[in-house]
């Protein structure tokens, strides 16, 4: 097995590029087919260094490899003699080592002169070289990704559909549970389905935009096109207007992401569903999901919850029902027993019907005189839409959206004179009671006021500080929502305990799992660290950074709400003798590279330049696919684009991970994070902890052990014994050498993060490291570290004053 993996790895590295696949020139493992200008490449690849081989298309020269199309996603090959060939009947076939057909284009052609070529748009074409006719193309057989000018399609006459189908997981191209498609409604709209149930809906198309995705108007001009031909077929295309390399992908988690490559990294432009309100029908029929902080459901005016007790508990899927039934027949005689209530900033509901109408007034009249019409909207780029069924999947944006007018009984909007008289009488009678109790109430209020004013002022100050910053997309959760999600912070939901305070697992009403960090009053981390983490991480988006969803500031409570990482933190695997066997060398190496990419984004590629100052194993979280996510930005610092060094009078961090210049003088730079990464890298390789490890009589630490191992055997003996069976020795030795370069005493001798990632992703020559001189030794009883670093290290850091 190991020999095969080593052979396969080396074979894949020896890549030879071809211009076309012909009957006499098949494509074998180790060979690639390049587009004319070298934008795309087709070849064999193996996700996550497994034995399974697939034929795929990816962007050439972009690391990590971004696969945009897979031919044999349902049938991998596992032998090194597979090839992709043009058959005598003109079709494209994938053969395994036994020359059995694993995948084919599925059609035969009366052509023996065809060839397969890859265009600069990423489209794989089978072309008849005699006539020049395209016989088959990959753009008509999409996977999980749309490239510019490829398209989704639905032909209602034939039933033919061209859809997006998610991967089963991040590393498994098998079709997953999510499917994206375009409808043939007038106007069309996009859907993501999870199995047979709607998961997300775009809202109807309005000439240049989807009405349920306002960002397509404001931040990413006209990235889509929807066209309908004479046969009624609808085509949805992702256009390339501003970026040379861009894509739309349906992820294995059900997210639809539009990204572009800026020359260094992928930048996220659109990501839906992005919040609670985006999920289909979260508030049920006639329920309105309001994009407040946090998002919440409410009933339209004139409606009440169908199941009031469930509604109070935050279970909104039952929706709402009318308080007063409609009496429609009077409208035609002038007795307006029904009225229309306008609601602004709305994502138009599902189940709409298009009505030919020249103006908003005509749209109103067409609904007014139709007893079954429950609502209408006149939308620029569409015209008149009416609803004859329940209003489902409605959300209200803070900005943007459409005006929806809902039919109500006139009594819901006012009432008759008798009703006004009764109300006036009730008010008069109540006035005396109110005045009589006012004095007593005021006296009690004065007693309580002084006791609570400081808490309110503090809470308001924190909220005002945040609102004065640009924290768009950050939600302010209500304490009640968090309490429901975490089962009142029960011990069963507790994930761990750190210096920040306890961390709890929670589940929101829409089923989304979250992690909640609850600031402890005894924590050394206060308002500065809390605010710092919110302001920094809310402005960052990268696959290798943990995503903050929001916060809660209520009374003395201060909580941070994150996306939940099912595999917790890296230290729970690396330092656990039973679980470390689950992370073989390929997984460890992939995690190492992911962390480096996250640091490069922080240091160089984000719009903020950030030094983390607390990079350590316990601050690396792992999602369900073992992708690493850098977390805990409470100690991070921003620096200006041309300023690569700063200092501080308050030294914060974790013993063992702090660089010499930072621990001794308070000077920090991106090279400080490089040092911390080096320690982390050596921990991941060895499975040993910097704060607990020592060996021989001199009690040498992990850095000294790594140095001696590298000098004696190239670092191969430094590897955790539980990972040796799956390793590539030269790769391990290279990583040990990189780790030693990162922990050099002088910052100038350490690589920056751009150089670091290049070292980890190429086979270029490495500088020779010097023996590391900075070490934190562990005493015999462990007392030096046991009081400073907790066992699980969820958030604990050392604070040293100078």
UniProtKB/Swiss-Prot annotation:
Highest taxon above the source species: Eukaryota
Domain EGF-like: start-end pairs: 273-309
Glycosylated residues in this chain: 48, 89, 112, 231, 262, 315, 331, 370
Modified residues (Phosphoserine): 523, 538, 618, 631, 691
Span of domain PAN: 328-410
Record bears the keyword Disulfide bond: yes
Record domain Bulb-type lectin: where: 20-139
CDD domains documented for this protein: B_lectin (cd00028), PAN_AP_plant (cd01098), STKc_IRAK (cd14066)
Statement: the UniProt record of this protein carries the keyword Nucleotide-binding: yes
GO cellular component: plasma membrane
UniProt keyword list: ATP-binding, Cell membrane, Disulfide bond, EGF-like domain, Glycoprotein, Kinase, Lectin, Membrane, Nucleotide-binding, Phosphoprotein, Receptor, Serine/threonine-protein kinase, Signal, Transferase, Transmembrane, Transmembrane helix
Transmembrane segments: 422-442
Cellular location(s): Cell membrane
EC number: 2.7.11.1
Cytoplasmic side: 443-802
Annotated coiled-coil segments of the chain: none
Active site: 614 (proton acceptor)
Gene3D superfamilies: Bulb-type lectin domain, Phosphorylase Kinase, domain 1, Transferase(Phosphotransferase) domain 1
Leader sequence residues: 1-19
PANTHER family, sorted: ATP BINDING _ PROTEIN KINASE (PTHR27002:SF506), RECEPTOR-LIKE SERINE/THREONINE-PROTEIN KINASE SD1-8 (PTHR27002)
Family that this chain belongs to: Belongs to the protein kinase superfamily. Ser/Thr protein kinase family.
Record's protein name: G-type lectin S-receptor-like serine/threonine-protein kinase At1g61550
């Amino acid at each position: 097995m190991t020999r095969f993996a080593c052979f396969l790895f080396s074979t894949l590295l020896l890549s030879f590029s071809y211009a076309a696949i012909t009957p006499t020139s098949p494509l074998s493992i180790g060979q690639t087919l390049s587009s004319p200008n070298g934008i795309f490449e087709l070849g064999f690849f193996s996700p996550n260094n497994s034995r399974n081989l697939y034929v795929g298309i990816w962007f050439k020269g972009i690391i990590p490899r971004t696969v945009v199309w897979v031919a044999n996603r349902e049938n991998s090959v596992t032998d090194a003699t597979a090839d992709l060939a043009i058959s005598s009947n003109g079709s494209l076939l994938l053969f395994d080592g036994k020359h059995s057909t694993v995948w084919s284009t599925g059609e035969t052609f009366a052509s023996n002169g065809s060839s397969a070529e890859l265009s600069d748009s990423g489209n794989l074409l089978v072309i008849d070289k005699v006539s020049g006719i395209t016989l088959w193309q990959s753009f008509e057989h999409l996977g999980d990704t749309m490239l510019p000018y490829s398209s989704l399609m639905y032909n209602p006459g034939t039933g033919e559909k061209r859809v997006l189908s998610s991967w089963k997981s991040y590393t498994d191209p098998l079709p997953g549970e999510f499917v994206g498609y375009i409808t043939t409604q007038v106007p069309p709209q996009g859907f993501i389905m999870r199995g047979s149930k709607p998961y997300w809906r775009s809202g109807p198309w309005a000439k240049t935009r989807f009405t349920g995705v306002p960002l397509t108007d404001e931040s990413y001009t006209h990235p889509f096109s929807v066209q309908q031909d004479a046969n009624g077929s609808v085509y949805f295309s992702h256009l390339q207007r501003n970026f040379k390399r861009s894509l739309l992908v349906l992820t294995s988690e059900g997210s639809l992401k539009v990204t572009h490559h800026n020359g260094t990294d992928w930048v996220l432009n659109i990501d839906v569903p992005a919040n609670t309100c985006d999920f289909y029908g979260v508030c049920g029929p006639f329920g309105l999901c309001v994009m407040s902080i946090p998002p919440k459901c409410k009933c339209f005016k004139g409606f009440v919850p169908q199941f009031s007790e469930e509604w109070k508990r935050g279970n909104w899927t039952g929706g709402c029902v009318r308080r007063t039934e409609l009496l429609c027949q009077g409208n035609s005689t002038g007795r307006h027993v029904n009225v229309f209530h306008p609601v602004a900033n709305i994502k138009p509901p599902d189940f709409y019907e298009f009505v030919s109408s020249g103006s908003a007034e005509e749209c109103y009249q067409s609904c007014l005189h139709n007893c079954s019409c429950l609502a209408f909207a006149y939308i620029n780029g569409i015209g008149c839409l009416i609803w004859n069924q329940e209003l489902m999947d409605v959300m209200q944006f803070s900005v943007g959206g459409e005006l929806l007018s809902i039919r109500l009984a006139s009594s819901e909007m006012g009432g008759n004179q008798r009703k006004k008289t009764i109300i006036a009488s009730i008010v008069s009678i109540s006035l005396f009671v109110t005045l009589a109790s006012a004095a007593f109430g005021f006296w009690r209020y004065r007693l309580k006021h002084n006791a609570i004013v400081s808490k309110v002022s503090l809470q308001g100050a924190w909220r005002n500080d945040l609102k004065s910053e640009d924290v768009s997309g950050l939600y302010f959760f209500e304490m009640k929502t968090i309490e429901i999600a975490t089962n009142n912070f029960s011990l069963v939901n507790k994930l761990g305990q750190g210096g920040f305070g306890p961390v709890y697992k929670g589940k929101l009403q829409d089923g989304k799992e979250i992690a909640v960090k609850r600031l402890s009053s005894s924590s050394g981390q206060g308002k500065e660290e809390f605010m710092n983490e919110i302001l920094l991480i809310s402005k960052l988006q990268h696959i290798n950074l943990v995503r903050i969803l929001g916060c809660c500031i209520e009374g003395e409570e201060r909580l941070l709400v994150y996306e939940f990482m099912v595999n917790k933190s890296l230290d729970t695997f690396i330092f656990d003798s039973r679980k470390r066997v689950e992370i073989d060398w390929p997984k460890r190496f992939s995690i190492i590279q992911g962390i480096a990419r996250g640091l490069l984004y922080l240091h160089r590629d984000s719009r903020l330049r950030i030094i983390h100052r607390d990079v350590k194993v316990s601050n690396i979280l792992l999602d369900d696919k073992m992708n690493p996510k850098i977390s805990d930005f409470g100690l991070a610092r921003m620096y200006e684009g041309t300023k690569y060094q700063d200092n501080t009078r308050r030294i914060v961090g974790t013993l063992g991970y702090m660089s010499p210049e930072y621990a001794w003088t308070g000077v920090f730079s991106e090279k400080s994070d490089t040092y911390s990464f080096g320690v982390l890298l050596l921990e991941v390789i060895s499975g040993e902890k910097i704060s607990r490890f020592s060996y021989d009589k001199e009690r040498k630490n992990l850095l000294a052990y790594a140095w001696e191992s590298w000098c004696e055997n190239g670092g191969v003996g430094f590897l955790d014994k539980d990972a040796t069976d799956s390793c590539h020795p030269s790769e391990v030795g290279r990583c040990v050498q990189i780790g030693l370069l990162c922990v050099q005493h002088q910052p100038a001798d350490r690589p920056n993060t751009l150089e670091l990632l290049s070292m980890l992703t190429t086979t270029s020559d490495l500088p020779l490291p010097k023996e590391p001189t900075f070490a934190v030794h562990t005493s015999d009883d462990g007392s030096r570290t046991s009081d400073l670093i907790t066992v699980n290290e969820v958030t604990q850091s050392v604070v040293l004053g100078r």
